[in-house]
Each structure stands twice: as structure tokens, then as C-alpha cells.
């Protein structure tokens, strides 16, 4: 779609890329196309949001697994950097995304061997494997989540991740319930 319409991303606030590496869901070999990877980098750099779940932009190419590692602020260890020290493990549990989390976040199976790059805020790590991270990229923001099985609590966490990545934290309490077990739907045009 991006190749057919270079202005496609202009109407978006946040892109969500979910799935395992080298699948149609995450893009697979399409990440080798510089038009596509550059368009998404430009979108985030100029203020857009990007949320990656699982192995987002995952395709082994040019020494990386995550082709958007610089955007996400995380990379998957594949043996190329085993001898590099990785010091960024400090968690930031008070981050906006986690403020409703009253229990440990459920990442399901999650992913192994994910590490944070310098400048990334690690929100949750388990056994020195990043499960959730937030990263500024230019004027934009990216969030990495290792897995998001459906639950009311995870729905709220994902909602907060979307708002944060879109620079829309102030919209949190628009059509909002303090109880994350309740979802609020508003049909403004219908007056309901």
C-alpha cells in the first residue's frame, strides 16, 4: 500500500506492526525495500507513532533482525552482538503506559533475547530480556511489546501505548472508565 500511495501515512497517527519475523503480518522481505522502510522511519521521525508487538519489522537483513530497531529502540539478539555489553536494563514502572497496571503485565509467550538500545526506556524486563519498552525517535515515539494476549488489563495497556505513541496522553480521560474491566463506547453522531 505504501508503494502505491506515498501519502498513505499522512492520514495516520499510529502504525501497529504485530507478528513473528518473516511473516506477512510483520512485512517479511518487504523490509528490504528502502522505499518502505524509509517511509515508515520518516513517518515516525516527523511525529508519528509506531507500536511493535512480537518481532515487528523482523527480517534478517544487513546485520539486523528488527529492520526498525533504531525506531523501536530494541533489537533481537541473534548472535552478532553476543560480545557487546548491554547495560540498559533499568525499568521505568511509572511510565504513562503502565500507570493503570495493578498487576504484572501478561505478555503471553512473549519473546526471548530482546535487548534495549541506548536511550530506550525499558518499561518491563524479565531475566534481562525486554518485554516492553518506549523510545523517542525524532519527533515521534515507538513502543515495543513482546506479546499482548487479550485481557481487559492488556486492552488498557495497549490503549495507553497508542495514546502515548500518538502524543495524545491528554485524551486518556475522554470516554474513559477508571475500571479497566469496563470499555466505554461513544456514538457521538447518534447522540449516544
Give, region by region, the residue ranges found by the protein language model.
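Extracellular ligand-binding/catalytic regions of CAZymes and related secreted enzymes
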Residues: 7-8, 19, 67, 72-78, ...
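Structural motif
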Residues: 13-23, 51, 142-144
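Short acidic loop-to-helix transition motifs that present clustered carboxylates
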Residues: 1-4
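A short, aliphatic-rich alpha-helical micro-motif
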Residues: 9-10, 37
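Residue-level marker of intrinsically disordered, low-complexity segments enriched
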Residues: 14-16, 95, 103, 112, ...
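A glycine-rich, often tryptophan-bearing local segment used as a flexible ligand/cofactor-contacting loop or short
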Residues: 22-110, 117, 127, 154-159
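A general structural motif
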Residues: 11-12, 47
Amino acid at each position: 500500500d505504501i508503494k502505491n500511495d506515498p501519502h498513505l501515512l499522512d492520514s495516520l497517527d499510529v502504525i501497529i506492526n504485530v507478528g513473528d519475523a518473516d511473516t506477512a503480518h510483520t512485512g517479511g522481505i518487504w523490509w528490504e525495500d528502502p522505499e518502505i522502510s524509509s517511509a515508515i522511519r520518516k513517518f515516525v521521525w516527523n511525529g508519528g507513532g509506531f507500536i511493535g508487538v512480537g518481532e515487528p519489522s523482523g527480517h534478517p537483513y544487513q546485520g539486523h533482525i528488527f529492520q526498525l530497531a533504531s525506531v523501536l529502540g530494541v533489537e533481537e539478539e541473534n548472535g552478532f552482538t553476543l560480545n557487546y555489553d548491554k547495560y540498559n536494563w533499568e525499568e521505568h514502572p511509572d511510565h504513562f503506559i503502565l500507570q493503570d497496571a495493578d498487576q504484572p503485565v501478561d505478555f503471553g509467550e512473549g519473546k526471548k533475547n530482546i535487548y534495549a538500545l541506548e536511550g530506550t526506556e525499558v518499561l518491563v524486563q524479565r531475566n534481562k530480556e525486554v518485554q516492553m519498552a518506549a523510545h523517542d525517535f525524532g519527533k515521534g515515539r515507538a513502543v515495543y511489546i513482546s506479546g499482548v494476549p487479550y485481557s481487559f488489563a492488556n486492552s488498557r495497556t495497549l490503549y495507553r501505548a497508542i495514546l502515548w505513541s500518538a502524543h495524545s496522553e491528554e485524551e486518556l480521560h475522554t470516554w474513559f472508565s477508571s475500571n479497566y474491566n469496563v470499555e466505554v463506547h461513544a456514538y457521538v453522531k447518534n447522540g449516544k
